Design a protein with these regions (language model features):
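Mature catalytic core of soluble alpha/beta enzymes
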Residues: 1-266
Length: 266
């Protein structure tokens, strides 16, 4: 196979996997060829058969007792906050600055914390049931919620893993797959090549380069940052005029952002 032919084959493989991943984790619309997260949200208390990729992702968060996946309504509010044109508009969605937003956040967090109100049942053979109590369904209908479940900031972590596993499964074992929000998978198992990952730090209002991390061999890397680091972050972060920053890392304990560091790499 020529280099051009191999590049074309890899491009098609990546594109097909990326399209499938986008559809599986989509919370806004349904697709004929897959049962996705949107379908699960629209059919609470029904058993659905999903793709193994989505089943595996749901099982991982469920096994880890990661209840942040149930904060779908609050992630939607955060996106509205971050899309605001000014502080006054943003504050309407901010539980730390608006009483109505605080009340809504507390209510969703209370539902999120209680497995009797919302939980996932994963019964094997890719069968999933999102259990939602009558009380939560009534509240969601009153508030106009469209998604109980949302991977939100975690989504690209699972997409990167899926893309990496798909590509490696076809024999491609050199190179890196990364997302602009800080998720990285290195495919190279040879250990013969050194890779570099640039590190940044927010100093005042300026994002500065402060070093480079080098590594070898297969790695999974996550670089969390508590500030907007480019246009893809536009709907995940908001900075008020007083420099207060809102980030996407909401806690299931109270539905609020408690980010304490400007960067974290794991």
């Amino acid at each position: 196979v020529s280099a051009g032919g191999e590049a074309k084959a890899l491009s098609l493989l990546y594109t097909d996997a990326a399209v499938k991943g986008y559809r599986l984790f989509n919370i806004d619309e349904s697709f004929e060829d897959v049962t996705n997260l949107y379908d699960i949200n629209q059919h609470p208390n029904e058993v659905l058969t999903v793709d193994p990729v989505l089943y595996d992702a749901l099982k991982k968060v469920s096994d880890a007792n990661c209840r942040e996946i149930y904060l779908g309504p609050l992630y939607a509010s955060l996106e509205n906050l971050c899309a605001s044109n000014d502080d006054a508009a943003a504050a309407q969605f901010d539980p730390n600055r608006n009483d109505a937003a605080a009340e809504e956040t507390a209510a969703v967090a209370a539902f999120t914390q209680n497995p009797d109100d919302i939980s996932l049942e994963l019964s094997g053979e890719n069968q999933v049931c999102l259990h939602v109590s009558d009380a939560y369904q009534a509240y969601a209908a009153e508030m106009g919620y469209t998604a109980y479940l949302d991977f939100f900031w975690m989504k690209n972590a699972f997409l990167i893993d899926y893309l990496a596993d798909t590509i490696r499964g076809e024999g491609y074992q050199l190179g890196i797959i990364s997302s602009k929000d800080g998720f990285v998978r290195c495919l190279d198992e040879t250990g013969e090549k050194e890779y570099r990952y640039p590190l940044y730090h927010l100093s005042g209002n300026e994002i500065q380069s402060y070093g480079t991390m080098t590594y070898e061999g297969p790695k999974s890397i996550v670089f969390f940052h508590a500030y907007q680091a480019g246009s893809p972050d536009a709907y995940r972060y908001y900075q008020y005029q007083d420099k207060t920053m809102c980030t996407p890392y909401l806690s299931a304990a109270d539905g609020k952002d408690h980010t304490a560091a400007s960067e974290l790499i794991v």
